[in-house]
Amino acid sequence: MLFRSYWIEDYDKFYVTWATNYLPEEFNFEDINYPREDKIYFSGNISAHGRCENYSTFAPFIQECEKNNIEFIHNDPFSNPLSEEEVILRTKKSILGVDIRGPEHIRNGYVPCRVFKSISWGHLGTTNSPEVFKELEGNCLFSSDTGQMFYVAMEKRTDYEYIKQAMLYVQENHTYVNRIKSIMSLL
């Protein structure tokens, strides 16, 4: 019965994925060469419980970081909100900018902003989400095994031409300018 109360007859829906927060002209391809630290700064939710549990997918990745002397530094935005500038800075200086989805996000095909932002900030796009990989048309690395993802990403993280192509793809297809154009095309 709850479903019926939200049903609207003859109403078309428009679904839009997230995008990077950069406008196309803000992309700086020199960010590919940004000095990286042997650390990963992750600003986002990591939860061991609930519907959006994602610790089970982060744990293997974090273990491989530790085995390889890469410090994984987590900032919970709910207990310690950072400015957008600080999140960008921390991501840029990270050795990797990864997008790791939990089981529920994988199941429902959630496409977050994180991967688009990481790529636009000069990082190799890396994800465990088949839907994200599909949305980026292969312009990122994919591994369902997040422990193995660490090694795949570390090996490819200095493939600057690949990263540049991914940045160009996001610049042309995944900014809010693209989202606005998509909406306008329906009017």
Label the predicted regions.
Residues M1-N69, H174-N178:
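Catalytic core of nucleotide-activated saccharide and alditol-phosphate transferases
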